[in-house]
Every structure is written in C-alpha cells, then in structure tokens.
Amino acid sequence: DTGWSHAYMDECFKREGIDTMLKNGEIEFLFVSHEHLDHFWGLQTVLKYNPEIKIIIPETFYPEGMHLIKGAEFITPGACNRIPHQGKLVQLKIGETNKLYEGCAAVAFDLPIVIRVRGEQSLFFNVKDKGLVCVTGCCHQSILTMADYGQQKIAGGETMYGVYGGLHIAPFGPLNERGEKIVKGMAKYNFKKVACNHCTGLPAVNRMIELGYPVVQGTGSNGSKSNLYVGNGDEVTFG
C-alpha cells in the first residue's frame, strides 16, 4: 500500500530507505490492498521513484481508481497522481488463490466497504517450519474470514502462525459487540505472533492482551499512538 499524503510518504520512504530500494528496482511490485485513500492516494510517491513498477490490485477497482493509476487529479476529494504508471498492471480475480512466488499467495475478497470502495486483497505467506502468516491492509473482510480461507485453501494452513497488518476491529472508538466477537474468535487459530497495527484500534489490542494473545509490541515512535502494538517504522520478523 502507498499511504495517503505524498509529502509524508516521501519523508517515510527516505527515513526507511524505500526511496533507494524503489530506484534500484529492489522492490518487485506494489500490492494495493484496496482503494481507501490512506492505502492508495500516496501512489505518486511510489511512481516518483519507479514509474515502471508492477502494480497488483483487486479487479473491483472503480474507474476513478484506474484513472488515478494512469495519471489523474480529482479536485473535490483532493486525490492526484501526476506521474502516470508505465509498468504492468495486474488485476486479481475475486475469490481465487493467486501464487505470486514460492511461499506467497494473494486472495481478493469481494465485499462493500465504506466510502464507495469494493473488495480487498490480502497476502498469505507459508513460512518454512512455522506455518501460515496472514498479511493485511485493513482486513475489512475480517481476520476470521481471512484465516478461515487460509486454513481451508492455502498450503500450510493447518498451522496458522501469525498476523501482520490492520484488522479494522475498533478503529474509531470502544470495542463493540462485533469487535468483541472477532477478537474472541481469533483464539481458535492459535496464532503465535499477532503483529496488528493501523486500524486495529487500541481497545481491540488491549482486549487481545487481556485474553493472553501474543501481541507484538512496537516502539511507539514516529507518531504511533502506543507501544503496545506495532506502529510506524517498526519491523517484525516471522521467519
């Protein structure tokens, strides 16, 4: 994903060395989980350093999203990309398991999401001698839906090892009944590492900790809300 603000993402890229990696072709592709502004509108910053990078999106992208990739400006919402994409664009079909490379698969889930967005794609990694790791953008489909898919249809799914990314459980306030159900439902997968971040929400993280889940702590740096879970600039190793 690309973040939202061009200036902020440029700052982050330089801080973490992503700008150099993009320029040197060390990053094989850009995987955009869904069309929400905080995951997609920072596209120009990526293309600034490598306009030919391969981009992978779900097939549910709206025409406006496709136009943004090609180079467009939308005045009212404030989205723009002045660097047209020149590389390969791959659209993943909903509900299919797509092998990206050995040990890594992508799946696009079909669902309506707030602010006129449809569909979200996520990643599964089969880590040798560990098990399956679920990697998400926001996981609007819910981590339960994603983990069930991994268990049933992805090689290595008999052992669910870890989670990384946003889980969209309590992003804007207290943990509600649905959020409580999701958090409690995670227990059946027996994850060994829960590296949740972004839209998971601190109330959900606190509940996971209360239930004894192995939540990976962060550093609380670079504007992160808390060190109780992974934040900006933090790294997690699953191998």
Regions found by a protein language model. Give the residues of each.
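Active-site HxH/HxHxD metal-binding segment of metal-dependent hydrolases
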Residues: 25-92, 96, 187-193, 209, ...
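Binuclear metal-ion centers of metallo-dependent hydrolases, dominated by the metallo-beta-lactamase
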Residues: 185-239
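Conserved beta-strand hairpin/beta-sheet module of binuclear metal-dependent hydrolase folds
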Residues: 1-16, 120-136
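Charged helix-capping and loop-helix junction motifs
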Residues: 175-185
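Active-site neighborhood of phospho(di)ester-bond hydrolases with catalytic His/Asp-centered motifs
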Residues: 1-2, 26-36, 56-59, 134-138, ...
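Pre-active-site segment of Zn-dependent metallo-hydrolases
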Residues: 1-29, 143-144, 150-153
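Active-site-proximal loop/helix segment associated with metal-binding centers of metalloenzymes
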Residues: 71-73, 77-130
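Active-site environment of divalent metal-dependent phosphoester hydrolases
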Residues: 6-7, 35-42, 62-65, 140-144, ...
